[in-house]
Amino acid sequence: MFDSLVDFLKTNIDQLNGHEVQISSEFKEHHNEDSKYIIKNWLFSSPEYRKWRITRLDGGKKLQVFNTVAYPNFESELPILGADILWFGTSQKLLAILDYQPLIQESKYLEKYCSSLGIIKEEYSAFDNNKMKNIYDSKKYFSPWVIICRGNKLNLDRDLNDIFHSFVNNYLNIYKSNPVNQFLNSEEIKINQIKYDKYSFEKDPADKLFKSFFGEKWTKKFINKFLFTLNNEIIH
């Protein structure tokens, strides 16, 4: 499950003249002790995106997880693309969170870079779950148009691929339109990406999930050395 999303991203990254970055074998593919859970990771870089990572967790019929985060280079003030998609097989429930995660919360910045998410939400009513917004800090690294779905098998089969494709294509089109930085310079962009990693290191809900499957030692290393690598940077 979700292999089609991985392939879709790889195709788009390839079209950006991106290349795969070699990562530690313990992150590339890792099994828990009884091999019921397998995690696979990919890391890419391109002229436009300094880091684009993909994670797939295979828990068989019980759980499937897909995550991707794209960091623009430090010359671009664009938001960070973030997507978390989870399928709970036992309860037949889909949870998806898709957002252009803003570096700042200034209204004009949000309107310029994030508001087009609203158009996508209008097309897919099941992915407009405002009831769950309170679990995310809207004053930090989430946009007012964050796409949230708490759906079912129908949403998984019928809607997910289409909305994910629209979500990624729209984001790439924003970059292709070559917007001029209006709000942040390169140093401020770097600082805000560092702050994003520090915030995510503290708040990411996947921490507990990974610890329960793969143990605390591996999870701590994985979060620091793969997921949020700027977490240890010092802001001057």
Swiss-Prot record:
Highest taxon listed in the record's lineage: Bacteria
Gene Ontology BP annotations: phytochromobilin biosynthetic process
One example GO MF annotation: cobalt ion binding
EC number(s) given by UniProt: 1.3.7.2
Record's catalysed reaction(s): 15,16-dihydrobiliverdin + oxidized 2[4Fe-4S]-[ferredoxin] = biliverdin IXalpha + reduced 2[4Fe-4S]-[ferredoxin] + 2 H(+)
InterPro entries the UniProt entry points to: DiHydbiliverdin_OxRdtase, Ferredoxin-dep_bilin_Rdtase
Pfam families for this protein: Fe_bilin_red
Keywords in alphabetical order: Oxidoreductase
Similarity field: Belongs to the HY2 family.
PANTHER family registered for this protein in UniProt: PHYTOCHROMOBILIN:FERREDOXIN OXIDOREDUCTASE, CHLOROPLASTIC
Protein's job: Catalyzes the two-electron reduction of biliverdin IX-alpha at the C15 methine bridge.
Protein's name according to its UniProt entry: 15,16-dihydrobiliverdin:ferredoxin oxidoreductase
